[in-house]
């Protein structure tokens, strides 16, 4: 009896597990826990017969003075725990690296060919066949090594044990796997593999476990690490990552089918539902929906990293609906702001309103309805096709979106040459902030209540939505404080003229000299107004469904951190768009999710 193997876990395997768990705990979802539990169970069930055979045939052994002595099918319990802890660590690392991804956008496979063949791009079918051939070749090689026996036995047992799983995983999800960003797959494989190579080297040198001579090829990756051991940890981590990726593929299928429907599916799917869907569902998708979804995600990443990372804390259909809502609002804003003249901007407002009218008339048709899609796209300009089509009209009221367009009309009233500046008073500022941000916040809460109904009165629900409008204004005030210089460059001043007059300034003076030090106290005043709105709405968040309180609070808190960064850099933020570091955003979101 000994503690050597147990101490390997205490020193090397448990610390990263605890660290990753603590870092990720506020963001854990019930479905993610179920995925990891299932994968750990599969790992134990699949590995026990194989490992038991290795021990019984003396390919692998454990000195009596390095283990506690309790076994399961002759496998030390410390070894069984290794199956669990390795699977847990690798799975959790993969989940963390892929939390930000919007999974359905990867369902159709790579958007660009991965390689060129002799006769042109390699098709998806060819990619599938090549991968299947590769993993089948590994199986044949493993069986051959077992047949040869002797020093090739352990190597053959590893290859023949792992390859059937890899073949199955590849055939079922090769498109999804190839579409994922390469780093999101290979980093969660490489990091734990390298780490376990080091741990295994130390254990082999100490004699904690032993590969019997005559069953290994006696090639070492480096001193103390047998090539079989290096291969074992590599292929097992590949299996784990492919396994959790397969569950993500199943979740992506569920989210896609929910998103294209006209109903709200707030409940988290069970593992059984995901497995059934994964094994039985057709792999035919509406390419328009998937392309538009990818465009919406790209737009969100480019325009607002805070909102992109914040969206990752929401789950399933709700997250997709929020991204689609943001896509329409952002696209409309960009078309109007980037218009070369006022008439073109007015044209785009009219077209946005037209797109809304038509989309809400078609709200009871699914997104993959070809006839409805053609009717919509024939009636509105091409730049609005994707944003209007994805809009979850069946789960939203139209009025706030029309109010948003009215806010854009306020922007058109700015005219430096004529001395026209519509934000004359603090009330004007509040009205503007409501139109361009309060409306969007209210739509977010409408989606929340559609997906996750709660037992509150209609009056209470409306009060919470009203508080959401105030929160939206807080975010807009923060934007205004941040973008004084950038807004002045396009002839806009959102600081009320009455406030400017108190400092002896006019809107025209701000446009001419947007870095005037007299603007610093006014910027503080706007931030104070933002903070006041933020504080007023905190109690209302507790009335939201429990599973979205954390994500809403974290998203808003992380965004409001912009205001704190502005205060810390009052004289240094005139040039360019202020950025909040990822670590700082993560810290604020982590604390808010607790």
Swiss-Prot record:
Bifunctional enzyme that catalyzes the reactions from geranylgeranyl diphosphate to phytoene (phytoene synthase) and lycopene to beta-carotene via the intermediate gamma-carotene (lycopene cyclase). It is found in: Membrane. It catalyses: all-trans-lycopene = gamma-carotene; gamma-carotene = all-trans-beta-carotene; 2 (2E,6E,10E)-geranylgeranyl diphosphate = 15-cis-phytoene + 2 diphosphate. GO terms for biological process: carotenoid biosynthetic process. The chain crosses the membrane at residues 3-23, 35-55, 77-97, 130-150, 153-173, 176-196, 227-247. Its main location: membrane. Residues 256-594 are annotated as: Phytoene synthase. It is a multi-pass membrane protein. GO terms for molecular function: geranylgeranyl diphosphate synthase activity; intramolecular lyase activity; lycopene beta cyclase activity; squalene synthase [NAD(P)H] activity. The keyword Lyase does not apply. GO terms for cellular component: membrane. It comes from Arthroderma gypseum (strain ATCC MYA-4604 / CBS 118893). Its EC number is 5.5.1.19, 2.5.1.32. InterPro entries: Isoprenoid_synthase_dom_sf, Lycopene_cyclase_dom, Squ/phyt_synthse, Squalene/phytoene_synthase_CS, Trans_IPPS_bact-type, Trans_IPPS_HH. It comes from the Eukaryota. Pathway: Carotenoid biosynthesis; beta-carotene biosynthesis; Carotenoid biosynthesis; phytoene biosynthesis; all-trans-phytoene from geranylgeranyl diphosphate: step 1/1. Keywords: Carotenoid biosynthesis, Isomerase, Membrane, Multifunctional enzyme, Transferase, Transmembrane, Transmembrane helix. In the N-terminal section; belongs to the lycopene beta-cyclase family. PANTHER family: BIFUNCTIONAL LYCOPENE CYCLASE/PHYTOENE SYNTHASE. Residues 1-249 are annotated as: Lycopene beta-cyclase. This is Bifunctional lycopene cyclase/phytoene synthase.
């Amino acid at each position: 009896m000994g503690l050597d193997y147990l101490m390997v876990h205490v020193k090397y395997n448990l610390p990263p597990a605890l660290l990753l768990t603590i870092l990720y705990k506020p963001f854990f979802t019930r479905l993610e826990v179920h995925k990891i539990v299932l994968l750990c169970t599969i790992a134990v069930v699949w590995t026990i017969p194989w490992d038991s055979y290795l021990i019984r045939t003396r390919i692998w052994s454990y000195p009596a003075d390095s283990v506690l002595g309790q076994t399961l099918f002759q496998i030390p319990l410390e070894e069984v725990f290794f199956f669990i802890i390795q699977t847990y660590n690798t799975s959790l690392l993969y989940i963390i690296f892929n939390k930000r991804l919007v999974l359905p956008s990867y369902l159709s496979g790579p958007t660009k060919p991965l390689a060129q063949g002799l006769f042109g791009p390699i098709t998806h079918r060819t990619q599938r066949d090549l991968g299947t051939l590769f993993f089948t070749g590994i199986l044949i090689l493993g069986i051959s090594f077992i047949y040869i026996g002797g020093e090739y036995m352990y190597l053959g047992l590893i290859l023949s044990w792992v390859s059937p799983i890899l073949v199955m995983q590849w055939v079922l999800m090769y498109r999804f796997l190839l579409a994922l960003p390469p780093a999101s797959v290979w980093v969660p494989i490489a990091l734990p593999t390298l780490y376990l190579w080091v741990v295994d080297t130390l254990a082999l040198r100490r004699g904690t476990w032993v590969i019997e001579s005559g069953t290994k090829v006696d090639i070492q990756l480096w001193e103390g690490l047998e090539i079989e051991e290096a291969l074992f940890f590599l292929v097992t981590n590949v299996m784990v990552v492919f396994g959790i990726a397969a569950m993500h593929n199943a979740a992506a299928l569920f989210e896609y089918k929910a998103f294209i429907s006209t109903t709200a599916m707030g409940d988290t799917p069970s593992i059984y539902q995901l497995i059934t869907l994964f094994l039985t569902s057709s792999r035919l998708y509406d390419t328009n929906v998937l392309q538009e979804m990818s465009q919406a995600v790209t737009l969100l990443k480019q325009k607002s990293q805070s909102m992109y990372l914040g969206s990752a804390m929401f789950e399933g259909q709700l997250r997709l609906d929020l991204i689609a809502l943001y896509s329409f609002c952002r696209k409309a804003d960009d078309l109007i702001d980037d218009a070369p003249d006022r008439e073109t901007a007015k044209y785009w407002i009219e077209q946005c309103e037209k797109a809304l009218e038509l989309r809400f008339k078609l709200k009871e048709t699914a997104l993959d309805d070809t006839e409805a899609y053609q009717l919509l796209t024939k009636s509105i300009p091409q730049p609005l096709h994707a944003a209007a089509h994805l809009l979850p009209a069946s789960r939203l009221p139209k009025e706030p979106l029309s109010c948003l367009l009215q806010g854009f009309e306020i922007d058109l009233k700015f005219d430096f040459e004529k001395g026209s500046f519509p934000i004359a008073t603090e009330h004007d500022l509040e009205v503007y902030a409501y139109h361009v941000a309060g409306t969007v916040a209210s739509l977010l809460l409408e989606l929340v209540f559609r997906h996750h109904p709660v037992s509150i009165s209609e009056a209470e629900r409306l009060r919470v939505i009203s508080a959401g409008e105030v929160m939206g204004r807080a975010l807009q005030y923060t934007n205004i404080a941040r973008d004084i210089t950038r807004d002045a460059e396009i002839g806009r001043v959102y600081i009320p003229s009455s406030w400017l007059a108190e400092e002896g300034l006019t809107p025209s003076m701000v446009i001419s000299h947007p870095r005037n030090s007299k603007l610093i106290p006014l910027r503080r005043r706007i931030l104070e107004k933002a903070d006041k709105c933020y504080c007023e709405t905190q109690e209302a968040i507790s009335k939201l469904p429990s599973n979205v309180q954390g994500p809403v609070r974290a998203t808003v808190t992380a965004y409001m951190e912009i205001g704190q960064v502005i205060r810390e850099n009052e004289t240094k933020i005139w040039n360019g768009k202020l950025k909040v570091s990822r670590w700082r955003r993560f810290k604020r979101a982590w604390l808010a999710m607790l």
